[in-house]
Amino acid sequence: EIRFKATKVIDFLNLTHLTQELAGNLSGGQKKLLELGRTMMVDAKIVLLDEVGAGVNRTLLKDISEAIIRLNKEKNYTFFVIEHDMELISKLCETVIVMAEGSVLYQGSFDEVKSNEAVIEAYLGRGMIQKNNLNS
C-alpha cells in the first residue's frame, strides 16, 4: 500500500526519473519537490512553505509552482507561503498577508497588496509613494 501511494506521488510530481537517486544527491529544487512528496505521503492538507523559491532555478521553480497549484486545486491542500519573491507570490497566493516588525500590516489580494500605500512605504520608502502618485 505504501509503495503504491509513493508511486502515485512520484508520478504526480514528475519525479520518476529520479527514483534511483539518493535525496542527498538531488538539487535544491528537486529536494523541494521531494518535500512536497513527503507532505503528500502523510496527506498533510495544511502545509507551511518557507522561501520555496530560494536557491531554485527557474525551470524547477515552475515545476514546484505547478505542483503547489495542482495540490491546492485537485487535492484541496492549503499552503502558507513565506516568500520574498513577489512574482512567485502573485502566481501561488489568493490572499497575501504582509507583515512588518512582527505585525500584520495589510491583508488582501496580490493586486491590493502591491498598490497599498502602507506596504509600499514599509518596504520601499515614502519616496516611492510620492513617485507613484506623480505617475498616476
Task: Tell what function each PLM region has.
Residues I89-K91:
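A short, surface-exposed alpha-helical micro-motif characterized by mixed small hydrophobic
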Residues E83-H84:
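H-loop/switch region of ABC-family ATPase nucleotide-binding domains
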